[in-house]
A protein has these predicted regions:
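Short beta-strand/loop turn elements enriched in aromatics
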Residues: 122-144, 233-235, 248-266, 277
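C-terminal amphipathic alpha-helical segment
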Residues: 195-267
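His/acidic/aromatic-lined binding-pocket segments of jelly-roll/cupin-type domains
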Residues: 87-89, 96, 118-121, 159-160, ...
Length: 323
């Protein structure tokens, strides 16, 4: 259902701190205020239960606003009325499980609306940090099945070194694992469906049969070289999302953030990887953008300017669909 809204101004979203056994109990200096009794592994920036922090809809969840005003948020070209992307920051103190996500077809077979293709942008990485993405050449599903039972699956994983600023694309069907040493901004289809293959002895459910069904031996996963343009760096531009990085001092207009193919304009998210900014425009109160916070820019947002208030490193994330 769409409400009677005709225009929505940019608004900041409060994060949701999600407990994970492999996470940290203290996220400083990245996040100062954490509401949890146990280790935090993920900070959801655009989860359905995240609450709007500014503007006339402050206090509502993101899911509630999408139910009320999906077309105003997404634009006329959107293929669905649901929130298209889940954006999060991942803090891994221990190795995550070796896992795989289903594609759209397989997810629907098991009663879910969509699968999960994702990407990781390294906000920070220690020397020697690594992630596992895909399987080594020659590995078969039988090999994977045997190694799951023997606890030796790691030896068949394709291991990538990761540095700050790297972008890793992980399409559905890719066996993968996040390891300690990096802090990752993840953009993904709005689905939290994971099939665990191997979990390092932790007492969590495994999904071996479904994970083998979901696994593709060859995928398009891997590091994506950045494309440097005059006013931005395109980190990735694939079927479900586009990530761009903007640096620079002074003011930047909302029009200058658009890419050439965004006609008509759709929903966008602005994430402050570092530094801070402020969004101002006619008809709405200024919206502050502190470090590691996110602002949603609805398709119908009025024109605005974003001011760099100090070392602003801006990541713009947009859902991709035919326009």
């Amino acid at each position: 259902m769409t409400g009677t809204y005709h225009q929505l101004a940019p608004f900041r979203i409060d994060p949701e701190f999600v407990g994970r056994i492999w996470g940290y109990t203290d996220l400083r200096p990245w996040y100062e205020k954490v509401s949890s009794n146990g280790p935090i592994g993920e900070v959801w920036l655009t989860g359905d239960d995240c609450r709007i922090a500014t503007g006339t809809h402050a206090g509502k969840t993101l899911a509630e606003l999408f139910r009320e005003a999906s077309k105003v948020l997404l634009g006329e070209g959107a293929p669905s009325s649901e929130s298209p992307l889940l954006i999060k920051v991942i803090f891994a103190r221990e190795k995550l499980s070796v896992q795989v996500h289903p594609d759209d077809r397989l997810a629907r077979k098991y009663g879910q609306p969509r699968g999960k293709t994702e990407c990781w942008y390294a906000l920070s990485a220690e020397p020697g940090a690594e992630v596992a993405v895909g399987l080594k050449p020659g590995v078969t599903l039988e090999t994977v099945k045997d190694e799951i039972q023997q606890g030796t699956l790691e030896q068949s994983l394709n291991v990538l070194p990761i540095s700050s600023g790297d972008l890793v694309f992980v399409d559905a069907g890719t066996v993968h694992a996040i390891w300690p040493g990096s802090i990752l901004l993840e953009a993904q289809q709005n689905c939290d469906l994971t099939y665990r293959m191997y979990d390092y002895g932790r007492p969590r459910e495994l999904h071996i049969e479904k994970s083998l069904e979901a696994t593709r031996l060859k995928t398009n996963a891997g590091k994506v070289p950045a494309t440097v343009l005059n006013d931005r760096t395109v980190l990735v531009d694939v079927g479900y999302f586009r990530l761009e990085r903007f640096l620079g001092d002074g003011l930047r207009s909302s029009q200058s953030l658009l890419s050439g193919k965004e006609q008509p304009r759709g929903l966008a998210y602005l994430f402050a990887a570092n530094g801070k900014g402020r969004i101002t425009g006619p008809g709405f109160e200024p919206v502050d953008l502190p470090a590691r916070s996110i602002v949603a820019v609805p398709a119908t947002a009025p024109e605005f300017e974003i001011e760099n208030l100090g070392a602003l490193d801006l990541i713009r994330i947009t859902p991709n669909w035919p326009r």
